[in-house]
């Protein structure tokens, strides 16, 4: 079914919204780039650019709080807590789901930098990752926060243990291979498949 946006009045409502209006009413061509969560993909699914990679490569200006061979750190444009720092690997890793066992030293470095930059009591520190589809940018980034949160909404957004937010320790455990192995051991079909091999 094709929805006639003209007839529903949506076009008139969006007329003053500039880029959003143009984007919503444009025709998708097979050769169009797709922009999603700070990353531009071409029609073949190849990454063309990434906001956080641009910061790491200094092709887009961003005031960095820290930089070394592995990571950069900076303040987000909309902080959620008293202190809020993003620690980002220079190597493009899309999300926590793309981490592998060999990434655990990188995760440890991200934590080390986060703790060093926060300089606050551990009881007020939260280190967490948002889980897709709730992540804001498709480039792995650790949220290092010193509570209190700036609003109740931010407290909810960064509630560890919810489907959208995982603790640093939980993600590291999973990336180390221990989490995947534990899940595999608890799935009867996986046990049966291993026994048949």
Model segments located where?
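HIT superfamily nucleotide-processing domains
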Residues: 2-197
